[in-house]
Swiss-Prot record:
Annotated localization: Nucleus
Stretches that traverse the bilayer: none
Biased composition (Polar residues): 174-197
Gene name tied to this protein: hoxa11b
Protein name: Homeobox protein Hox-A11b
Amino acid sequence: MDFDERITASNMYLPSCTYYVSGADFSGLPHYLTQNQSTCPMTYPYQSTALPQVPSVRDVAFRDYGIDTSNKWHHSRGSLSHCYTEDIVHRDGWTSPTPRGGEILVKGSSSGGGGGGGGHPGSSNHTPGFYGSVGRNGVLPQAFDQFFDTAYGSSEGSATPTAHAADADRQAAKTSPASAQAGSDSAESFSPKSSSGHSEEKQSRGSGGQRARKKRCPYTKYQIRELEREFFFSVYINKEKRLQLSRMLNLTDRQVKIWFQNRRMKEKKLNRDRLQYFTANPLL
């Protein structure tokens, strides 16, 4: 080929080739943007029949993600009809397509979940046509209903034991104040705090605990001071001195007698503690 020959604008220069190819040779092939799978077949080293049916890339890439498909992208929804709300509406016989399909799903799921313990989003209070064709949960196809059956079945089975446990807790809460009061009464009856406590304890034991326990009568500071002074002079008190103290302190003879008994027990315990202390520390 001579150098003086001019190349037309339709010719193509291939860097890996040493000759020019005329554009007229490619006139039989359509433009690559207008090609589809039928006009441009391709051979694969593997069997294409063994692969499942996969939707085209354009069908998946330009789904209803904020793109107006009516006037821009002309793609087929045949294989993905279960993904579009308006297709489901037309298929189930609804009057008109609504853009609030997402709100319907959300409201349906919230009202179904807020029902009873065994309720689920596919209950009877929703539109039967929509959820019956889509699935029990209102989003996934019907093939996934078996998983929701297992989940909701376990929750319904566990609802009855939970109710029984709640009833048992209520019964225990009702009975606990009475048992606590009875326990406190028994603990007070066995605590040797004062002389009146000992006397009333014996009375309650004799009557079998049917009669209510009397209220404690604490001694005043003046009464305790006079009783301690008398105990300092004589650990054991005779009957005459006991009657005199009872009249002076406005106490009964029994109260004075039991107070001296308790005071002697307390003194014995203090002496025992002192003995142990000095025995453990002989240098003191």
